[in-house]
Amino acid sequence: MNLIKNGKKNLEVFKISKSEFKNLDRKIDELVKKLLIELKKKKLFLAAMESCTSGGLINAITNIPGASEVIKGGLIAYSDQEKIVHGVPKKLIEKYTVYSPEVATAMAHQIIREIKGSQIGIGITGILSRPDPKYPSKKVGQANIAVIFKEKTLIKKIYFPPQKERKKAKAIIILKTLETIREIVK
């Protein structure tokens, strides 16, 4: 999978500071409300394949009334095997690792294929709180988000300070994913 389009690398990198972890629930709710308005207005539906956020993105959206008008569905593909079962090529995982932007992009493509009627596909993968012995080169505190809409693909690589609470790490990834969805549909 090639992350270079038109001679430009299709990947943005963000380093999250500790101060950005304040008031995450409020920030997420506010962003979801804005996103719901935009998606309803444009009659768009989304679907997500989530790994490290364990369904947290879909949960955050469905916490706000009106989510059923924009969500087609989602799936949690936590293990490598589950990603493969849902169409992420095993060779892609072996070449780039399960935590890569390439795998996040494949997850986003596959969820659109799997959940019919979705125009926006989201793939989220990352390593939150413990090193993975299968992938020793991957450090704790990183995630990759891919959002696909029409012919556009936005990929965000996020680095954040390791958190004692996994909930906070998931929340920052969810916030950045919501921002990316808004960015791609504008």
Q: Language-model features: where?
A:
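Short alpha-helical segments enriched in small residues
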Residues: 2-186
